[in-house]
Amino acid sequence: MNTSITARELFDLQRDRLSLRWIAGQQGEHRQIDSGDTRARRPSLAGYLNTIYPNKVQILGTEELTWLDSLEPNKRKETIEKIIQFQPLTLVISKNQSCPEDMRTAADNSQIPLWVSPKRGHELLNHLSYHLARILAPRATLHGVFMEIYSIGVLITGEAGSGKSELALELLSRGHRLVADDAPEFTQIAPDVLDGTCPEILQDLLEVRGLGVLNVRHMFGDTAIKKNKYLRLIVHLTKPITEPTPSGYERLTGDSGTRHVLDLDVPLITLPVMPGRNLAVLTEAATRLHILRTKGIDPATMFIARHSNLLERRPP
């Protein structure tokens, strides 16, 4: 899913935090950058003035403006034209420095937004890079119920009617927290991190068959809702299996695997839904087991090692 942001949207988002003033190029407010564009061409999202590998947001600090002032008139004009030619999303001048008139004119003529901020260059760089990276990060919407269980993000998935919402309701009654029902949105904010949030229209809501839509915040209190959580585990509910001993399920290690989400392989544990099974307890146990495995503790491996040692000690 591609996301985009316009110069106007970025300015409105950061105006108060960075004390931005828009001094030229107001006609370029609809200029935009999208995630597909950044992945295809791989420019830096924000950085100090660079006329060789241009950034999407060019920051002009004291050294950059001093360097421009030191150029001969023809070279200065050529450099400013080159900056404009790269078509950045915006130019930002730091520390409330005076903007050169020729740069202001060039920004107006080419409709390149030109902003001024009292913040220092590295503050602008860090802040804009961070927020642009989050806004334009790859994202996906998955079907399921996303919850915080024992302080980690767990996505409960399964076909319609498998009992996801009823399980979520039981987990809520046991003190765990809801992030999103039905359509949680996941954003890859780092190479190994998927951040899950709830769409605004679904905020605080949980749909349970027979009961309809429930407001979790009103029923369980503010502490039952979590704004966002990193996805660490997927628990998948399967349809009932009638065989007494289901083939394909490892008795020692359980049914564990991974699911590919965006660029990450997320650990997955499959639980068969059968009459009489307490899925809430099983989901809690699956979460605890995952936490142990991340610490290098695997009960199945320990048992296999004990069994092997016992066989080795037995006389022939």
Curated annotation (Swiss-Prot):
It is an enzyme of class 2 (transferase). InterPro entries: HPr(Ser)_kin/Pase (IPR003755), Hpr_kin/Pase_C (IPR011104), Hpr_kin/Pase_Hpr_N (IPR011126), P-loop_NTPase (IPR027417), Ser_kin/Pase_Hpr-like_N_sf (IPR028979). Residues 206-215 are annotated as: Important for the catalytic mechanism of both phosphorylation and dephosphorylation. One of its GO terms (biological process) is regulation of carbohydrate metabolic process. GO terms for molecular function: ATP binding; magnesium ion binding; phosphorelay sensor kinase activity; protein serine/threonine kinase activity; protein serine/threonine/tyrosine kinase activity. Its EC number is 2.7.11.-, 2.7.4.-. The active site is at 143, 164, 182 (proton acceptor), 251. It catalyses: [HPr protein]-L-serine + ATP = [HPr protein]-O-phospho-L-serine + ADP + H(+); [HPr protein]-O-phospho-L-serine + phosphate + H(+) = [HPr protein]-L-serine + diphosphate. The keyword Cell division does not apply. It holds the Pfam family Hpr_kinase_N. ATP binds at residues 158-165. Mg(2+) binds at residues 165, 207. Homohexamer. The Walker A ATP-binding motif also binds Pi and PPi. Belongs to the HPrK/P family. This is HPr kinase/phosphorylase. It comes from Xylella fastidiosa (strain Temecula1 / ATCC 700964). The gene is hprK.
